[in-house]
Amino acid sequence: TISAQQLDEYYRQDVVFIIDLRSPKEYLECHYFGALNLPYEDFDEIENTILEHLPKEGLMILYCDRGSASLMAARELMKKGYRVKSVVGGIHLYSGSNLYFSPMHSKINKNK
Protein backbone atom coordinates (compact mmCIF):
# COMPACT_ATOMS: atom_id res chain seq x y z
CA THR A 1 0.00 0.00 0.00
CA ILE A 2 0.98 3.62 -0.42
CA SER A 3 -0.20 6.82 1.19
CA ALA A 4 -2.02 9.60 -0.59
CA GLN A 5 1.17 11.67 -0.44
CA GLN A 6 3.20 8.90 -2.10
CA LEU A 7 0.79 8.72 -5.04
CA ASP A 8 2.26 11.88 -6.56
CA GLU A 9 5.80 10.56 -6.15
CA TYR A 10 4.93 7.35 -8.00
CA TYR A 11 3.07 9.32 -10.68
CA ARG A 12 6.35 10.86 -11.81
CA GLN A 13 7.87 7.45 -12.64
CA ASP A 14 8.02 6.23 -16.23
CA VAL A 15 6.04 3.00 -16.25
CA VAL A 16 3.11 3.65 -13.92
CA PHE A 17 -0.52 2.86 -14.60
CA ILE A 18 -3.05 4.45 -12.27
CA ILE A 19 -6.37 2.62 -12.18
CA ASP A 20 -9.58 4.01 -10.66
CA LEU A 21 -11.81 1.13 -9.53
CA ARG A 22 -14.90 3.24 -8.85
CA SER A 23 -18.02 3.48 -10.99
CA PRO A 24 -17.94 5.50 -14.24
CA LYS A 25 -20.22 8.09 -12.62
CA GLU A 26 -17.85 8.57 -9.67
CA TYR A 27 -14.89 8.68 -12.04
CA LEU A 28 -16.48 11.46 -14.11
CA GLU A 29 -17.19 13.50 -10.98
CA CYS A 30 -13.62 13.36 -9.68
CA HIS A 31 -10.53 11.32 -10.57
CA TYR A 32 -6.76 11.37 -10.44
CA PHE A 33 -5.28 12.91 -13.58
CA GLY A 34 -4.45 10.23 -16.14
CA ALA A 35 -6.19 7.40 -14.29
CA LEU A 36 -7.86 4.63 -16.26
CA ASN A 37 -11.39 3.79 -15.08
CA LEU A 38 -11.82 0.06 -14.50
CA PRO A 39 -14.83 -0.42 -12.19
CA TYR A 40 -14.25 -3.02 -9.49
CA GLU A 41 -17.59 -4.75 -10.19
CA ASP A 42 -16.42 -5.38 -13.78
CA PHE A 43 -12.86 -6.21 -12.81
CA ASP A 44 -13.09 -9.99 -13.29
CA GLU A 45 -14.67 -9.65 -16.73
CA ILE A 46 -12.17 -7.24 -18.24
CA GLU A 47 -9.10 -7.97 -16.15
CA ASN A 48 -7.46 -10.23 -18.74
CA THR A 49 -8.08 -7.79 -21.59
CA ILE A 50 -6.54 -4.93 -19.64
CA LEU A 51 -3.61 -6.99 -18.40
CA GLU A 52 -2.67 -7.96 -21.96
CA HIS A 53 -1.69 -4.34 -22.55
CA LEU A 54 0.07 -3.64 -19.26
CA PRO A 55 3.67 -4.84 -19.01
CA LYS A 56 4.50 -6.84 -15.89
CA GLU A 57 7.54 -4.66 -15.28
CA GLY A 58 5.28 -1.63 -14.95
CA LEU A 59 3.71 -0.56 -11.69
CA MET A 60 -0.06 -0.44 -11.25
CA ILE A 61 -1.46 1.89 -8.64
CA LEU A 62 -5.06 1.16 -7.74
CA TYR A 63 -7.48 3.35 -5.87
CA CYS A 64 -11.16 3.23 -5.07
CA ASP A 65 -13.50 5.20 -2.86
CA ARG A 66 -12.05 4.35 0.56
CA GLY A 67 -9.31 1.78 -0.11
CA SER A 68 -10.92 -1.64 0.45
CA ALA A 69 -11.73 -2.62 -3.16
CA SER A 70 -8.32 -1.50 -4.38
CA LEU A 71 -6.63 -3.59 -1.69
CA MET A 72 -8.55 -6.73 -2.72
CA ALA A 73 -7.83 -6.16 -6.43
CA ALA A 74 -4.16 -5.49 -5.67
CA ARG A 75 -3.85 -8.82 -3.87
CA GLU A 76 -5.29 -10.68 -6.86
CA LEU A 77 -2.97 -8.94 -9.31
CA MET A 78 0.07 -9.59 -7.13
CA LYS A 79 -0.76 -13.30 -7.18
CA LYS A 80 -0.44 -13.10 -10.98
CA GLY A 81 3.00 -11.54 -10.78
CA TYR A 82 2.16 -7.86 -11.30
CA ARG A 83 3.72 -5.01 -9.36
CA VAL A 84 0.81 -3.33 -7.62
CA LYS A 85 0.22 -0.67 -4.98
CA SER A 86 -3.07 0.33 -3.39
CA VAL A 87 -3.76 3.85 -2.11
CA VAL A 88 -4.67 3.66 1.58
CA GLY A 89 -7.92 5.51 2.21
CA GLY A 90 -8.76 5.85 -1.48
CA ILE A 91 -9.54 8.97 -3.44
CA HIS A 92 -11.30 10.62 -0.49
CA LEU A 93 -8.17 10.63 1.61
CA TYR A 94 -6.12 11.91 -1.32
CA SER A 95 -8.51 14.70 -2.27
CA GLY A 96 -8.86 15.77 1.35
CA SER A 97 -5.15 15.74 2.11
CA ASN A 98 -4.40 19.36 1.15
CA LEU A 99 -1.32 18.27 -0.79
CA TYR A 100 -1.41 21.35 -2.99
CA PHE A 101 -1.61 25.06 -2.34
CA SER A 102 -3.83 25.71 -5.33
CA PRO A 103 -6.50 23.55 -7.01
CA MET A 104 -4.79 24.41 -10.33
CA HIS A 105 -1.82 22.28 -9.30
CA SER A 106 -3.82 19.32 -8.10
CA LYS A 107 -3.77 16.04 -9.98
CA ILE A 108 -7.47 15.63 -9.15
CA ASN A 109 -9.89 16.39 -11.99
CA LYS A 110 -13.26 17.52 -10.67
CA ASN A 111 -16.00 17.76 -13.28
CA LYS A 112 -18.81 19.47 -11.43
Where are these regions (language model features)?
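Active-site flanking residues adjacent to catalytic metal/cofactor-binding acidic residues
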Residues: 19
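Rhodanese-like catalytic fold shared by cysteine-dependent sulfurtransferases
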Residues: 1-10, 16, 24-59, 65-112
